[in-house]
Each structure stands twice: as structure tokens, then as C-alpha cells.
Amino acid sequence: MNLIQTLEKEQFDKLSAGKTIPEFGPGDTVIVNVKVVEGERSRVQAYEGVCIGRSGGGINESFTVRKISYGEGVERVFPLLSPMIDSIKVVRRGKVRRAKLYYLRNLRGKSARIVEKKQDRTAAVAAAE
């Protein structure tokens, strides 16, 4: 390992020490709880939408979440290890065949829906026990 990789690994371990980051990918609906500072007060705001892509790797990894707010599409890019992210929760898994879902920007209504990924029987039985 060279010096840069060593330093990045140390930073990655330090930043991800207190967090549990779930496994999620493009097509998954996620709720990202973001810390918002307004003046002297801070609060946690939930941002729910579809993950349309992940980019980068290691300490520089980020993901893009798209939601429809009052009929207008809103996208937000979050660094995965940002201290402003309180928590990430996966609401549902989407079945997609692409790594980047930028085509959703051009779709409206029912055509913009993503099919939910079905659990196989063995995983469902294991989860029930």
C-alpha cells in the first residue's frame, strides 16, 4: 500500500467508526436523515427518494437521490461519509439493470416507477426466523 492509500484508509475508518451504512444501490428507495443547521439551532430533516447512482470509491464515495417535490424533480448528491448525514435507511429495494438511472429524469408518472425486487424464498424464510 502506498502512502495515499494508507492515509485514505485511516480517514475512512475514522469517519465510518460511529456509523452504520446499509448496503444500497441504484433503484433503491432510501431515507437520508440530514442534519440541518439554522442559526444556532440544528435539527434532523428526512430526505426520501430513489437512489439514481453511486460514484467514487472509498472516502470520496457519493450517491445521488432523486425525489419529486410538488411536481418538480429534485436531486441531491450526498457524500457517503459526510458528518451532515445522521442516518440512512433503505425503504424498498428496486429491480434495475443499470448503474446510473439518469433516464428517470425524462420520465413522468407511472412510467417513472421502479419495480420492487422480490426476495427469494430462502431469504424470506431466514428473515422470518
UniProtKB/Swiss-Prot annotation:
PROSITE patterns: RIBOSOMAL_L19
GO molecular function ontology, one term from the record: structural constituent of ribosome
Biological processes per GO annotation: translation
Keywords, in A-Z order: Ribonucleoprotein, Ribosomal protein
Alphabetized Pfam families for the sequence: Ribosomal_L19
Keyword Ribosomal protein: yes
InterPro entries: Ribosomal_bL19, Ribosomal_bL19_CS, Ribosomal_bL19_sf, Translation_prot_SH3-like_sf
GO CC terms, sorted: cytosolic large ribosomal subunit
Similarity annotation: Belongs to the bacterial ribosomal protein bL19 family.
Role, per record: This protein is located at the 30S-50S ribosomal subunit interface and may play a role in the structure and function of the aminoacyl-tRNA binding site.
Name listed for the protein in its UniProt record: Large ribosomal subunit protein bL19
Organism for this UniProt entry: Rhodopseudomonas palustris (strain TIE-1)
